[in-house]
Structure formats: structure tokens, C-alpha cells
Regions:
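C-terminal, non-catalytic extensions of nucleic-acid polymerases
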Residues: 76, 80, 113, 145-357
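Glycine-rich, histidine-containing beta strand-loop boundary motifs that form or position
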Residues: 15, 22, 132-135, 164-166
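Glycine- and acidic
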Residues: 1-7, 48, 52, 57-70, ...
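Helical catalytic core of nucleic-acid polymerases
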Residues: 1-118, 124-126, 141
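Hydrophobic, Leu/Ile/Phe/Ala-enriched alpha-helical segments that form helix-helix packing faces
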Residues: 43, 119-123, 150-158
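Composition- and surface-driven signal marking solvent-exposed, interaction-prone regions
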Residues: 23-27, 134-135, 150-152
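Beta-rich nucleic-acid/ligand-interaction surfaces
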Residues: 137-145
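Glycine-centered loop/turn motif at secondary-structure junctions
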Residues: 127-129, 158-159
Length: 357
């Protein structure tokens, strides 16, 4: 569930180990459920640095692995892999010891999903808005201590334990998978306050994220794009009369340079040795089309750009287009109070204007 828009003071509440908890509540493994529960409890205890409790679980089997607590995170991750693997087996398409043949529609995931629907309605009945729900988390804008406590108490009724991990001071939700947010409060790491969290390729692009949000220095790697195809990629120089002779020698009879199924490229200015980045058609090998996201620009392998010291020939217009596109997404949801300038900051807004000039 997603309600795209810009919001403030958005509490992020996550269920701790939702699917494993659902397995417990359903008693899915009968007499063996308790053993599974111990693994889950041990993982949560380690995650919360309650090592004394973790040492007593699973018959004390983990105690010797916690003598060096610096290895605790690795142990927690190992337990997480085991837990998630068991959950995956409960809904696998093949027979196995963890799958009940009556479980034809993933009862574990269904219990969690139905709970989140119930929670959404319950929060709305309290007079609060719900703007984003994922598998095991809910986001509530303008959240108060009372509504946070309500969510946690509601979870207990169904056997779930919520954790209030962070609150976003600013939150722009584009769709159910893409958002950008500034952290206003964090439960475990105060240094994260004021930093930006992004999801989705558009806002996670390093150039866009740094330019609009984090303001870290732009580095060479930020101006490189990794492209992959299932067939083959070529740099095509057809019709380009300004191709340097050094590059022309590497071309085939069709004025193309084979670069493989994957590669790292930079957009470069006309005349800098770049070509059109094309992918070969899967069925018609004589047919080519622009690799996704590369149309209208010339491209050169990033290694070549660096070797020939052509960094100053990187085409900034490509990155301006990326920034402008991200800005346009944010502006879709702004208003007189929650303006674009307010969201990204007045200084950043001015830099974007300079970029477009």
C-alpha cells in the first residue's frame, strides 16, 4: 500500500521477524516449533546485544560462539539465513520436511499480510494517516507517542513485536517501492540524524543522491553507468565523422566495437571518441536498439575515459537530465507549505537552477 506524497514526522515501525513469528503463532511445525522459536529468539537477542540471553538459548549451543562478541553480527546473519531458508521451504513448490501439503497459498505470508491490513484500518480509525505499508512495516506521518504505542500494543494481540527504528523528518513517497527521506530520529545511531535514505534507482543514483541530498563530492565513479544485456553490446560509430583514428582501428566492418554483455561506461561529449551504445536483438542478429537509458548520448568505456584522461570530456548534460527528472518527481507532490525548496533546501534548489542554466 502506498499513498504518494510529501509528509513530515513519519514514524517507521517494523515487525521484528514477521514470518518467523507467524510460524510460531500458527504452530506450523507442531512439536518442533519450539526449536525454531529458539533460533529466532537467539537471533533477536544477538541483534539487540543481549548476549547473556543468547548464550542460554538453543541449549547453550551458541555460548562458545559468543566468547568473542565482535563476531556476533556474523552469527546473527548466519541464524537469519537459516530462519529465512526454513520459511522459504514452507511454501516451496517441491515436497520437503517443512512444507505441509495443505499449505497451498503460503499461509505464513498470508497471516502477516492480513495483519497489516487490520493494522492499517485500526490506525486510520484512530484518526491517523497511513502512507506506506510493506511486508512487515508501516509508515505513519505526524506520528505521536500515543499512536506509536497503539501500534505496538496492537501487534502484541497477534503475537508480533514492533520496533520503532527511525522517524523521517521529511518523506517523499513516489510509489510503493521508491522514496527519498531525511532521517529526523534514529533508535540506534544518532549519527544518521540529518542524513538521507533513498530507495529506487532514480534517487539512489550516486550523482543524483549526492547532488540533491548528501552534497558529498562528485567522484569519477559517480559519473559511470553499469549496463548489462542478455545478448551483446556494441559501441556503434555509424555516421560519426569525428571518430578519432585510434578508435576507428578497433571497429568491425559495420563500424561497431564489441564490448560484451556487461560494461561500465561514461557519457562523453561529441567528438570525444564516444559512440552509440547498442544492444543486439535476441532473434534478429542484424537488428540493434539503444541500451536502456543511453539514447541521445555518446558513450565510451569508463576504463578508456580514465586511461586517456578524458574526464573533462564527460557530458554533464546527461547527469543534468537525471537531476531534472528527480526534481520533477519531487515537484509532483509539493505545495505552498511543503515546497520543493523546503524539501531539498534552498541552497540545493539554487544549484539545480544553475545546472539548468
Amino acid at each position: 500500500y502506498a499513498a504518494p506524497g510529501i509528509y513530515t514526522d513519519v514514524a517507521v515501525l517494523d515487525v521484528a521477524s514477521m514470518h518467523p513469528t507467524s510460524i510460531e503463532q500458527l504452530d506450523l511445525f507442531g512439536e518442533y516449533t519450539e526449536k525454531f522459536s529458539d533460533i529466532k529468539k537467539a537471533r533477536i537477542a544477538i541483534k539487540r546485544k543481549d548476549f547473556d540471553a543468547a548464550r542460554t538459548l538453543m541449549g547453550g549451543k551458541l555460548a562458545r560462539h559468543l566468547n568473542d562478541t565482535s563476531q556476533a553480527k556474523a552469527l546473527s546473519n548466519a541464524l537469519k539465513i537459516a530462519i529465512n531458508s526454513v520459511y522459504g521451504m514452507t511454501s516451496a513448490r517441491f515436497e520437503n520436511s517443512f512444507k505441509d501439503p495443505r499449505n497451498i497459498d503460503n499461509i505464513v505470508a498470508k497471516r502477516g499480510a492480513l495483519f497489516m491490513v487490520e493494522l492499517k484500518h485500526a490506525v486510520q480509525e484512530q484518526g491517523f494517516q497511513v502512507v506506506h505499508i510493506k511486508t512487515d512495516s508501516i509508515k505513519i506521518p505526524n506520528a505521536t507517542p500515543e499512536i506509536i504505542a497503539f501500534v505496538m500494543e496492537f501487534g502484541v494481540k497477534y503475537g508480533y513485536e514492533f520496533e520503532h527504528e527511525e522517524t523521517f523528518s521529511k518523506f517523499c513517497l513516489v510509489n510503493d517501492a521508491v522514496y527519498v527521506a531525511q532521517i529526523g530520529w534514529h533508535a540506534e545511531d544518532e549519527s544518521k540524524v540529518g542524513t538521507w535514505e533513498t530507495t529506487g534507482a532514480q534517487f539512489q543514483h550516486p550523482y543524483v543522491k549526492k547532488f540533491l541530498f548528501t552534497h558529498e563530492p562528485i567522484e569519477f565513479d559517480d559519473m559511470c553507468e553499469i549496463k548489462t544485456v542478455n545478448t551483446a553490446m556494441y559501441l556503434d560509430y555509424t555516421g560519426l565523422d569525428d571518430t578519432p583514428m585510434a578508435f576507428a582501428k578497433t571497429l568491425n566492418s559495420n563500424l561497431q566495437k564489441f564490448v560484451g554483455k556487461a560494461g561500465k561506461f561514461c557519457p562523453v561529449k561529441p567528438g570525444a571518441g564516444g559512440g552509440f551504445l547498442l544492444r543486439q536483438d535476441k532473434t534478429d542478429l542484424q537488428k540493434f536498439a539503444a541500451v536502456t537509458g543511453t539514447k541521445d548520448f555518446f558513450w565510451l568505456e569508463s576504463e578508456m575515459v580514465k586511461t586517456l584522461k578524458l574526464e573533462d570530456q564527460i557530458d554533464q548534460k546527461y547527469f543534468t537530465r537525471l537531476v531534472d527528472s528527480a526534481v520533477a518527481q519531487i515537484k509532483k507532490y509539493t505545495n505552498d507549505i511543503q515546497s520543493y525548496e523546503w524539501f531539498v533546501g534552498a541552497d540545493t534548489a539554487r544549484e539545480v537552477e544553475k545546472l539548468a542554466a
